[in-house]
Amino acid sequence: MSERKEGRGKGKGKKKDRGSRGKPAPAEGDPSPALPPRLKEMKSQESAAGSKLVLRCETSSEYSSLRFKWFKNGNELNRRNKPQNVKIQKKPGKSELRINKASLADSGEYMCKVISKLGNDSASANITIVESNDLTTGMSASTERPYVSSESPIRISVSTEGANTSSSTSTSTTGTSHLIKCAEKEKTFCVNGGECFMVKDLSNPSRYLCKCPNEFTGDRCQNYVMASFYKHLGIEFMEAEELYQKRVLTITGICIALLVVGIMCVVAYCKTKKQRQKLHDRLRQSLRSERNNMVNIANGPHHPNPPPENVQLVNQYVSKNVISSEHIVEREVETSFSTSHYTSTAHHSTTVTQTPSHSWSNGHTESIISESHSVIMMSSVENSRHSSPAGGPRGRLHGLGGPRECNSFLRHARETPDSYRDSPHSERYVSAMTTPARMSPVDFHTPSSPKSPPSEMSPPVSSMTVSMPSVAVSPFVEEERPLLLVTPPRLREKKYDHHPQQLNSFHHNPAHQSTSLPPSPLRIVEDEEYETTQEYEPIQEPIKKVTNSRRAKRTKPNGHIANRLEMDSNPSSVSSNSESETEDERVGEDTPFLGIQNPLAASLEVAPAFRLAESRTNPAGRFSTQEELQARLSSVIANQDPIAV
């Protein structure tokens, strides 16, 4: 009842004050102006958003010269920094702070301060703005302290218009409400992009609500909630995604580039490989053509099956390589007798015969027209014995013998006297050479061949000889040593019978076996005409088989070689003429080229007669006895015709 009376009294007092503004206040007493001003206590208030609040700051002193100041959260509210919805009204002895349409931003601690000459005093109160519809207002009973020092705070009572307040109880009223978007002026209530809504209630004053984004919270969306973190994470996620895309693009580009390079390399390799194959094929074809041309040039025209028994002594005087005189002497002494060694300076005769020869080149046979220069043995070589016939060391001219043995043999042959020129054997030789029935080919022309150089065509002294059967060419190196020595026919038959295995074991030649011709029938006639006795048969050993040899071309009459061999002659050699006469008389009758009728028969008979045994490669058959060598040489030397010479 007292508060109501006070309120009524206040209202009356206000009216009185308004009516009596021009009248001075009566002085109640002298002691009142001397006291410092005191402020009444202000009460804290809680209100909904959009409501109206009033804070009053009153003093018990009626001193006219008082100044009032308001502070919010320690900051003075004046015309410059106070919000638009806040107003301050000054009255004598009191001051009011009115908040129209309170919002969440208006929440805070408000303080009122009075300033006078007598002293200063202050009072504070808290204002809370609630968004919900439930509004609770609690007001505590105010206690008046009549005597409070200026230093102690002064409580100010806060009253809310339109609300019933009591000192001891707090009541809350609820009613129906609805949300309405705030006007444009009121949208500033929400910050940071929040949406403003106003709650209107019939029983309660209107209030404001804010719908904040996810990054912000608070009454007005003023608080950030992990905003920077979300932003940072978003940036990182975006950067990571961009980096991932860049990496994927980079790796893809590298793979495509490698694939393109690989394809280019494969294509280039294939092209170069084809080009190389083409070049190799061309080179091979060119090499093959060159080889075929060389082989054709070397071989000449081919004849597949020539008669192997058609044997000739091929004298080829042209060699591809220039050989020194010493090498020529050694090789010719090893292989054959040089016909220039057995002719004298006064009696020489040469003939040129063109006959088909037989040779081998790379396993093929070829027929060429060769000019065989055969020179008859002169009577100057009558006796070639190095010692007595009893059985001293005798030299033999064989395929593997050295040049020393041949030199010594030729030296002894040169030094023997010309004792067989006037012998009866020479007459027989003349008869054989001059009888028309025998048809002995005698030519009186010198050899001229494109294959023989002028220096090797004939010896230094002009001479004439009869044609002599040539020697067959052998494809084996061991048989390329033609011997102009022969044995009697009966000895040949016996030796061929005693050595069949030896002939078949060495140097098997299927061409001679398959295509060999039978021996000439003239040989049988000669065997009947010229008979020999068994006393001249030497020790049986493998007969020497003379075959057609390519090295027969080296049997060229070289006078220089003969002179060099004559320089090596030994004057101490001794010869026995009596023994050689008897042996030459018997063996000379079996010489095949003395009784031939035509060159064709000679070529057919010479092959089996002058066949060299394959046992020459056998080391045991390399040496022969002196009787056989002497018989062969004497048969050739003794039958020389002194008249024809």
UniProtKB/Swiss-Prot annotation:
This is Pro-neuregulin-1, membrane-bound isoform. Residues 178-222 form the EGF-like domain. Residues 269-645 are cytoplasmic. Signal peptide: none annotated. Residues 139-164 have a biased composition (Polar residues). The chain crosses the membrane at residues 248-268. Proteolytic cleavage close to the plasma membrane on the external face leads to the release of the soluble growth factor form. InterPro entries: EGF-like_dom (IPR000742), Ig-like_dom (IPR007110), Ig-like_dom_sf (IPR036179), Ig-like_fold (IPR013783), Ig_I-set (IPR013098), Ig_sub (IPR003599), Ig_sub2 (IPR003598), Neuregulin (IPR040180). The gene is Nrg1. Residues 1-52, 139-175, 340-364, 380-406, 433-463, 531-593 are annotated as: Disordered. It comes from Mus musculus. Belongs to the neuregulin family. The cytoplasmic domain interacts with the LIM domain region of LIMK1. Forms a ternary complex with ERBB3 and ITGAV:ITGB3 or ITGA6:ITGB4. Interacts with NRDC and BACE1. The keyword Mitochondrion does not apply. Residues 392-402 have a biased composition (Gly residues). Residues 547-557 have a biased composition (Basic residues). Keywords: Cell membrane, Disulfide bond, EGF-like domain, Glycoprotein, Growth factor, Immunoglobulin domain, Membrane, Secreted, Transmembrane, Transmembrane helix. Residues 20-247 are extracellular. Residues 1-19 form a propeptide. Residues 37-128 form the Ig-like C2-type domain. One of its GO terms (biological process) is synapse assembly.
